[in-house]
Amino acid sequence: MSQALLIFDGTCDFCTRAARWIKKLDRQQRIRIEPFQKAGIPESVGLTYAQCEQAAWLQTSDGTLWRGAGSVNAALSIATGNRLPLSLYQTWGIRQIQDSVYKLIVKYRHRIPGDTPHCQQFPADCAR
């Protein structure tokens, strides 16, 4: 079975913490997690660098692409083996609320505390 790929902002403290949290939940190692700054990562799923600057992305093992809050919910569902996060996200009303909150987080992500950014910890991962 191939892994899903979660693409996140490796220069963001909050994003790095979220990625690390998902990795801890993913005991079966179903998700490969990479910063979009890593050479070739955006292109490997048909995305541009600019698209990855705007949101996190997750490509499932069947090729489905999820963006933003959808990518987070898909990652949680895959990591835990529980469809509930993604099922809730797909419910009308909940999706709109989560997407709105996600947009706020994206706007202020570099002000939200978290871990030392991935690209600061692993500079070789972020060389383009």
Residue ranges, per PLM feature:
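Local sequence-structure signature of Cys/Sec-based thiol-disulfide redox active-site neighborhoods
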Residues: 1-24
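A short linear-motif detector with a strong N-terminal bias
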Residues: 11-14, 35-38, 99
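Generic structural marker for isolated residues within well-ordered, non-membrane alpha-helices
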Residues: 19, 38, 72
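Glycine-rich, phosphate-binding/catalytic loops in enzymes
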Residues: 24-25, 75
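Short, structurally constrained coil/turn elements
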Residues: 25-27, 52
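Thiol-based oxidoreductase modules, predominantly thioredoxin-like and allied folds used
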Residues: 28-42
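Thiol/selenol-based redox catalytic cores and closely related redox-interacting motifs
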Residues: 41-128
